[in-house]
Amino acid sequence: MEHTYQYAWVIPLLPLPVIMSMGFGLFFIPTATKNLRRIWAFPSVLLLSIAMVFSVQLSIQQINGSSIYQYLWSWTVNNDFSLEFGYLIDPLTSIMLILITTVGILVLIYSDGYMSHDEGYLRFFVYISFFNTSMLGLVTSSNLIQIYFFWELVGMCSYLLIGFWFTRPLAASACQKAFVTNRVGDFGLLLGILGFFWITGSLEFRDLFKIANNWIPNNGINSLLTTLCAFLLFLGAVAKSAQFPLHVWLPDAMEGPTPISALIHAATMVAAGIFLLARLLPLFISLPLIMSLISLVGTITLFLGATLALAQRDIKRSLAYSTMSQLGYMMLALGIGSYQAALFHLITHAYSKALLFLGSGSIIHSMEPLVGYSPDKSQNMVLMGGLRKYIPITRSTFLWGTLSLCGIPPLACFWSKDEILSNSWLYSPFFGIIASFTAGLTAFYMFRIYLLTFDGYLRVHFQNYSSTKEGPLYSISLWGKRIPKGVNGDFVLSTTKSGVSFFSQNIPKMQGNTTNRIGCFSTSFGAKKTFAYPHETGNTMLFPLLILLLFTFFIGFIGISFDNGATDNGIAGLTILSKWLTPSINFTQESSNSSINSYEFITNAISSVSLAIFGLFIAYIFYGSAYSFFQNLDLQNSFYKESPKKAFFGKVKKKIYSWSYNRGYIDIFYTRVFTLGIRGLTELTEFFDKGVIDGITNGVGLVSFCIGEEIKYVGGGRISSYLFFFLCYVSIFLFFFLF
């Protein structure tokens, strides 16, 4: 066993050979390398698979041995200072290693099909392989300086991949936005690391945790300075994990290719912030103010993300806000000290969200032959609908992923989210109310995504792309083009003669049933494809979806916990995850009341599932194919018979839509305050520099020139006169200087 741990340092380095080989080939033999570009996917997957096998072996040893291993190399700079670097293998590391490698492998396989047509295929695989290497290095780091080094590499790779299609202005802008926003957090992280080094004289986790255990009883360190440094560390996690108020970069990051969106949201970029807080939780626990701040930021983020996802039309952007909300749940769990629940939700959410993002990529691929390759159209859920007939495999996997994120048992996210809800109610009713209400919102907006995409009719056939006067009832005016007079463009989902609000899916019946227009085709593996209607993607893209579906079904069972009386340090012995995390849980002092009995579990489960089902029902009322039936029965009017109530309900819907679609006006606020404010300050500085500073300099020169021109005639051109005036000036100067 010791022999296995000694070579764990190989795991982050395994993807590097294929990266270097591709770079060598592109530099020296570019033509041959590009012609044979598809073969590079195999070594990328193979090397990461070896890393996965190694990670699984380490995890099994962690479960059996429950030990923490750390290996260090020391580099002595001088007698007073030495730099230590190495790797740390503990339960948290082993969890993250398995998560990164499994999701990374499936994303690589998926990318081979998704990016096969792209000219930047090799560049994409270089970036994504280096992304995996950086994240693996981050989670195995043994000190803060190593974490910061790999932290920056993870950020760099994410910027490269977000702006992968850099010729598109929106992608370039999104890359810049992610960079600038994360600079704020990264600068705070660096200051926090330097502050703790100044306080403790060490960057090693073991030293920081030992000192942290003595802070409260001994009170030997300035608590204000310590709290400030801890806040700066937390600021880095806020930016990286897209927490309020530094969350604005995450939705725009969807401008990158869909596979990288799956990797960022599941196992790398946004997971890095949660990992950092989990790693440093023993440090934060000794600072109650920071713990309260973490839980408060998490609560705000989970609710804000859910509300902003309610009205998004872009399928990837909707999933991005969903990620933001779920990361808020993890942050809340860490803030209330529920270490196991936070990591459990990190695991279950990663596989479910990877399934949803890769499923959305399959949907986008199926829509592109119909609407073109513009993301405004291929990712627009308003143009979709009825896709369950054409891409049934993708539809099934997407449905299960949606139900998992909604918290429907026995799928993965049900177990972890239910644990967070239970712990939040025990910690504070305020947090419990917000978390539970947001769980209902999660079910609503996730099922909304599913219904708009797969339910009803394929609405793209009702759209007018020809820019001619003839066209069906629907037009693309909802995207700000050709908006008819008298129609509120901010609130209309689709412009029809009957007028359809955002909260509806009323599709008028066209002449001739749309099902009669469907050509003969099959969506099974190896099927003949037609471009008249959406078609299922290839096996390379479907295989990862099916594997992730298995994870979504079964990964949640590792955290099922019941208190049967046989516990070890308050941790239920029958729980695989608890046994896995026992050293970390004991170290972070998680209370034993996290274990619950069967009755409490069933009670909590009924409550959370009821909220989820209610959210699903409301979403189906607004967006399901049965909406037309309810509208014909005047069901909604029966609830609001009085016109003032109907008008009030309409105003509320419009306000909610406007808030959600405009991202809570936060981006607008940042643009006006920071972007325009900094631009105005720059213009003011430029005016001061040119008008005042340059004016004084040029004015002094001009005045000197004019005075010189005037007094040069006083001497009459005689040298004796010049000497006389010179001596007079010197005498006057000496007189004032000396007396």
Curated annotation (Swiss-Prot):
One of its GO terms (molecular function) is quinone binding. One of its GO terms (cellular component) is chloroplast thylakoid membrane. The keyword Transport applies. The chain crosses the membrane at residues 9-29, 39-59, 89-109, 125-145, 147-167, 185-205, 219-239, 258-278, 280-300, 327-347, 354-374, 396-416, 425-445, 542-562, 610-630, 719-739. InterPro entries: NADH_UbQ_OxRdtase_chlpt_su5_C (IPR002128), NADHpl_OxRdtase_5_subgr (IPR018393), ND/Mrp_TM (IPR001750), NU5C-like (IPR003945), Proton_antipo_N (IPR001516). Keywords: Chloroplast, Membrane, NAD, NADP, Plastid, Plastoquinone, Quinone, Thylakoid, Translocase, Transmembrane, Transmembrane helix, Transport. The keyword Phosphoprotein does not apply. It holds the Pfam family Proton_antipo_N. It is found in: Plastid, Chloroplast thylakoid membrane. It is a multi-pass membrane protein. It is an enzyme of class 7 (translocase). One of its GO terms (biological process) is electron transport coupled proton transport. NDH shuttles electrons from NAD(P)H:plastoquinone, via FMN and iron-sulfur (Fe-S) centers, to quinones in the photosynthetic chain and possibly in a chloroplast respiratory chain. The immediate electron acceptor for the enzyme in this species is believed to be plastoquinone. Couples the redox reaction to proton translocation, and thus conserves the redox energy in a proton gradient. NDH is composed of at least 16 different subunits, 5 of which are encoded in the nucleus. This is NAD(P)H-quinone oxidoreductase subunit 5, chloroplastic. It comes from Agrostis stolonifera (Creeping bentgrass).
